[in-house]
Amino acid sequence: MSSASQEQLLKDQNIIVFGEDFGRHAHSLEHLLRPLFPYNQWIWVETIGIRSPKFSIYDLRRIFEKLTKWFKPQVTHEGIEVPENITIVRPLMIPFNQYGIIRRLNRWSVNRTVGRALQARGMATVLSIYSIPNAADYIGDFNETLKVYVCVDEFSLWPGLNYKMVKNMEDLLLKKSDLVFATSKSLQKTKSNGKSETFLLTHGVEFQHFNIGPKALSSNHPLQICYFGLFDERSDQKILKDIASSLPEEQIHIYGNVVCSIDELTNFKNIHFHGPVPYKKLPQVISAMDIFILPYVRNELTENINPLKLKEYLSTGRPVIATGLPEVAAYKDHLYLGNDSQDFIEHIKAIKAGKSLDTQKTLEYLAANETWVAKAKFFSSEILKRLP
């Protein structure tokens, strides 16, 4: 990174982060902050989630993972190396935050553990950055000079969450925050601290990582159609079933954690679930794919999201078909929009027959404007304006 680039980044700060687990999977807050890692001192706090666990394989694995990591503080998922200037803090916590006594115990544990880490690192002055609603219980307890909220989702509408509890948490979080960013225009309109402007900060992309180059298509061979990312209730399974049944020769590949029922999809011989793939290995795995698809159910939750994977798919330089959510429709000149199964099927047929878009313009735009470094610079500039 050039010295000119460095000058625009936040530097020489002590920062507490409340977000998803460090290095567990490629999430937006970690992507955003990664360009700032070398220039600041960090305490990264891993708390429990806001959803009460259920008796499922996924949740049991998460519980085991959490228990294991409590005893190995600097070990991350997939063994990712943690820089020396980042201290990972994993307070001992109990799920079921909806119960007042447990919530108070968790707050005590977090404050005690983080306080010790701050003292050990000699961090007397700090700022906090957070992207999860339950951070409301902890921010402001560490005498921060600035409290920064990066809102990445409408968490209160997530399936399985306690709407009232999460809504109250986020209302308190917004009230405590000095600076608020939102990753979509719809979130920007609804997330305000009542004191200052909420800034639009859309997701970036690690462009070079995903720019795998074009691939020639053949009408004589089955298409390899790909979805990678978290597969959950937001994913439109009807679209996938209709593609699989209408185009039985084409092969659909799904990479990522699955956290919803997929019983109906597993009946199709041309739908393949491969499980999660480490972020570093994704380019190699997806290099054989012809088309990337983002099929979403349309509802209040998805209308608020800005899919993190969208720009990653576009950066491949290969055809992308996606449900026309508001943040996706903004890229209508760079991809194929599909509002139902028939749209997706017709686009796939047209692409196989030779239809194409000017991907070079897309790639040039993403490389020049949408990298995570560019996002980190904007993020830094707004913070620097407000630091004492």
Task: Please report, for each region that a protein language model flagged, where it lies by residue.
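Carbohydrate-associated surface elements
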Residues: 186, 201-207
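Nucleotide-sugar-dependent
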Residues: 235, 280-285, 292-315, 322-333
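Conserved donor-binding/catalytic core segment of Leloir-type glycosyltransferases
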Residues: 218-235, 240-244, 253-255
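Membrane-proximal helix-turn-helix segments that form the acceptor-binding/catalytic region
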Residues: 32, 112-119, 123, 162-180
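Acidic anion/phosphate-binding donor-loop and adjacent secondary structure
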Residues: 157-163, 192, 205-221, 263, ...
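A charged, aromatic-enriched C-terminal amphipathic alpha-helix characteristic of glycosyltransferases
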Residues: 355-385
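Nucleotide-activated donor-binding/catalytic signature segment of Leloir-type glycosyltransferases, i.e.
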Residues: 261-283
